[in-house]
């Protein structure tokens, strides 16, 4: 039977009997992850998978395959595109609105790992774009213990299962299982990785670790100060609740194809770049003929020797095929995300493509914004303060206002058609004012006399002029 069926028709679900067993949604998503995860590891990771991504040809010796594998380099198209898309969201800092001062202070180290809100948003957006969605747990020390809330990001691979109920008109988690890895000291200098499952229920948690019989047993438990599970989710390509597909899976497949094509071309160029010396006219019964420096060859009457090398016509076709794959990657990446194509097109089609591309990124930005809003809400509930809301950048391409546009805004403000707040907001979004500029603070400063008026200098009397006598 064809062995490929073992991969494409593999088990999609299992009967969950232990706390470590994933649910059916996890099994439905898992086949889409390995290629993307291996591409993130770069050339070293792709080489370590050897025949999985770079097949060994029929009658190709193992030694020849190892040499070909060592010369193969995986181009980083997928990784660069993922970084570019995530970077668009934080091209301008995430803006907080109506957030209390203590929470704003926590946003400078949102995950207790030294990452501020913008860096955390960038890394979380990469995971969301990579897998299709991700979740964030707003955790905090138990009541009475020192510490403050912090945010932990989980990928779909680490979300093993969940249960939900409709409570007060909202779908809320009643059970959540999260896979974690923690590092613990091992001896004087070493460390070991411990795999554990965090089981969350409203107001409580349990930690389960693998025991001596390879069965997970309860290691720790406790209560949480919130009556619900503080877990927020954001999607980039939603299929069902807590289920998604990687939005760039097609680009990952094209990246793999480019890796294989470049490997084939590099191997053929390596072999054919050295011409082969051929001898003609020697009888088959003659001894083996060799040529080299300091050697003389006695040719038969009709014998001759010449170098044979390929014409290179097939190489041109392979180069063109690689160019076509790279063009497909550029068009899928730039056109679908930014609405820009490298090929020629009409102005109207550019507008349509731009709106579609912006809509794709708009959904990602809106999902990220909603998730941060929910995390701020949970964060505020822990502290008993107002979490407020946020605004995630939607200006994905740098577009600085032109001088004519700035002049038009100033004329509208002078005529009283727009307010000072509208003027400053447009100048700030148009990148005329810096990222650190705060519109509300500027308005308050001007209204309270923050702009100091410089008094006119007092003219000093000229000492050379005699004083005029006072009138009697």
Where in this protein do the model-derived segments appear?
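Short secondary-structure capping micro-motifs at structural edges
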Residues: 120-124, 313-317, 359-360
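Short secondary-structure junctions and interdomain/linker hinges
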Residues: 88, 92, 96, 114-120, ...
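Residues in well-ordered beta-strands of folded domains
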Residues: 137, 177-179, 298, 391-395, ...
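Extended, charged amphipathic alpha-helical segments
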Residues: 215-348
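Extended, regular secondary-structure scaffolds
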Residues: 129-238
């Amino acid at each position: 039977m064809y062995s490929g069926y073992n991969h494409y028709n593999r088990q999609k679900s299992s009967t969950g009997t232990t706390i470590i067993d994933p649910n059916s949604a996890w099994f439905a998503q898992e086949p889409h992850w390995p290629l993307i995860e291996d591409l993130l590891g770069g050339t070293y990771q792709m080489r370590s998978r050897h025949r999985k991504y770079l097949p060994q040809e029929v009658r190709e010796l193992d030694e020849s395959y190892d040499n070909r594998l060592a010369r193969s380099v995986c181009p980083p198209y997928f990784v660069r595109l993922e970084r570019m898309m995530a970077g668009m969201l934080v091209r301008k800092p995430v803006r907080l609105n109506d957030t209390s001062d203590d929470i704003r202070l926590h946003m400078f180290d949102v995950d207790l790992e030294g990452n501020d809100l913008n860096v955390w948003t960038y890394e979380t957006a990469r995971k969301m774009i990579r897998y299709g969605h991700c979740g964030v747990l707003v955790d905090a020390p138990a009541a009475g213990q020192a510490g403050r809330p912090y945010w932990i990001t989980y990928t779909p691979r680490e979300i093993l299962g969940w249960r939900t109920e409709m409570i007060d008109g909202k779908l809320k988690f009643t059970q959540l299982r999260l896979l974690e890895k923690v590092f613990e000291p091992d001896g004087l200098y070493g460390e070991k990785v411990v795999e554990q499952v965090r089981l969350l229920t409203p107001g409580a948690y349990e930690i389960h670790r693998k025991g001596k019989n390879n069965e997970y047993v309860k290691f720790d438990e406790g209560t949480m100060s919130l009556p619900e599970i503080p877990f927020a989710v954001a999607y980039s390509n939603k299929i069902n609740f807590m289920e998604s597909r990687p939005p760039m899976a097609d680009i990952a497949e094209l990246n793999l194809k480019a890796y294989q094509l470049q490997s084939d071309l590099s191997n053929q160029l390596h072999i054919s770049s050295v011409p082969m010396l051929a001898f003609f006219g020697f009888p088959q019964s003659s001894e083996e003929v060799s040529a080299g420096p300091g050697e003389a060859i006695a040719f038969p009457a009709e014998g001759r020797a010449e170098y044979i090398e390929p014409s290179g016509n097939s190489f041109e076709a392979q180069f063109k095929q690689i160019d076509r794959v790279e063009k497909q990657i550029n068009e899928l990446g730039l056109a679908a995300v930014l609405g820009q194509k490298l090929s020629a097109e009409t102005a109207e089609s550019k507008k349509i493509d731009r709106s579609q591309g912006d809509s794709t990124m708009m959904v990602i930005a809106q999902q990220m914004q909603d998730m941060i809003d929910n995390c701020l809400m949970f964060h505020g509930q822990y502290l008993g303060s107002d979490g407020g809301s946020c605004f995630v950048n939607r200006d994905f391409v740098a577009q600085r206002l032109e001088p004519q546009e700035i002049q038009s805004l100033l004329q509208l403000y002078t005529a009283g058609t727009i307010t000072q707040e509208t003027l400053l907001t447009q100048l700030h979004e148009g990148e005329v004012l810096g990222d650190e500029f705060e519109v509300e603070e500027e308005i308050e400063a001007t209204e309270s006399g923050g702009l100091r008026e410089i008094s006119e200098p007092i003219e000093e009397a000229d000492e050379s002029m005699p004083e005029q006598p006072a009138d009697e």
